């Protein structure tokens, strides 16, 4: 699969799944804008890995929850490169807690970043893609969007909303040859899971038919495919990457 001469924006590209997506897209030939909101050092490390993979990219800072900042940043990168071909909405955060103890700001911030942030990016990029008569939007949802999870009402709702956004935009943008899909990772071995005890890890592995945690690169491989010309007849789909944990 080649993405030669394509321009991509990956939100939340400073670590985890986002970092792997940046490296895979750049390695396939795309110029990758690596978005981050807070950790510039981590974003610079992603850029270093992009270069190590033989790719090219640039670090861009903006908070996807900020509509104006997002619109201005995406307009600037489109002016710089003349186009945007691939948008990967990966930026996200979690503020877990039981419903009766969840604060309003914890609910709101997760929805603002995970769902409204993706809306901001889609809206800012869609017009350019429509003018180009082509593009790829890939939203990073989650297994819990489909299964739910105790203590994650805000996170689950935000990721379920992403699936609704994906399907609606797939219908709306299809006449301009823009494919919109989602990936729904299961339990992925990132810094978010590194705090688990060995006992917790073993218990979880018992429920995964493939008997291992996923890796960021497992998810990035699917994103790469969906961003490619080979996926030109796929839109409105949710691809699970969960080792069989949820079928």
Feature annotation, model-predicted:
Residues 127, 171-175, 232:
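Alpha-helical segment proximal to the catalytic Tyr-Lys
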Residues 7, 14-15:
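Conserved glycine-rich cofactor-binding loop
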Residues 40, 61-72, 104, 217-218:
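The beta1-alpha1 cofactor-binding region of Rossmann-like NAD(H)/NADP(H)-dependent oxidoreductases
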Residues 98-99, 103-111, 193, 204:
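Substrate-binding pocket helix/loop in short-chain dehydrogenase/reductase
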Residues 2, 119, 134, 178, ...:
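C-terminal substrate-recognition "lid" of short-chain dehydrogenase/reductases
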Residues 122, 158, 166:
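Active-site helix of classical SDR
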Residues 142:
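Residue(s) in the substrate-gating loop at a strand-loop-helix junction
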């Amino acid at each position: 699969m080649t993405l030669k001469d394509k321009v991509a924006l990956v939100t939340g590209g400073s670590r985890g799944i986002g970092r792997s997506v940046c490296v895979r897209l750049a390695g396939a030939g795309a110029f990758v804008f690596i978005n981050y909101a807070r950790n510039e050092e981590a974003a610079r490390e992603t850029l270093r890995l992009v270069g190590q993979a033989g790719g090219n990219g640039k670090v861009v800072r903006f908070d996807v929850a900020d509509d104006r900042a997002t619109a201005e940043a995406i307009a600037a990168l489109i002016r710089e490169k003349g186009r945007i071909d691939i948008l990967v909405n990966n930026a996200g955060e979690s503020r877990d807690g039981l419903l009766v103890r969840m604060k309003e700001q914890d609910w709101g911030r997760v929805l603002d970043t995970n769902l409204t942030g993706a809306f901001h990016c889609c809206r800012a990029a869609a017009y350019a893609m429509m003018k180009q008569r082509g593009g790829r939007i890939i939203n990073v949802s989650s297994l819990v969007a489909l299964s739910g999870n105790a203590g994650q009402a805000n996170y689950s709702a935000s990721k379920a909303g992403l699936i609704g956004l994906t399907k609606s935009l797939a219908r709306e943008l299809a006449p301009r040859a823009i494919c919109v899909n989602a990936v729904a990772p299961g339990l992925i071995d990132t810094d978010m899971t590194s705090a688990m005890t060995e006992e917790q890890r073993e218990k979880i592995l018992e429920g995964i038919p493939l008997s291992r945690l996923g890796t960021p690169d497992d998810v990035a491989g699917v994103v790469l495919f969906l961003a490619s010309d080979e996926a030109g007849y796929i839109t409105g789909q949710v691809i699970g990457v969960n080792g069989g944990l949820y079928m």
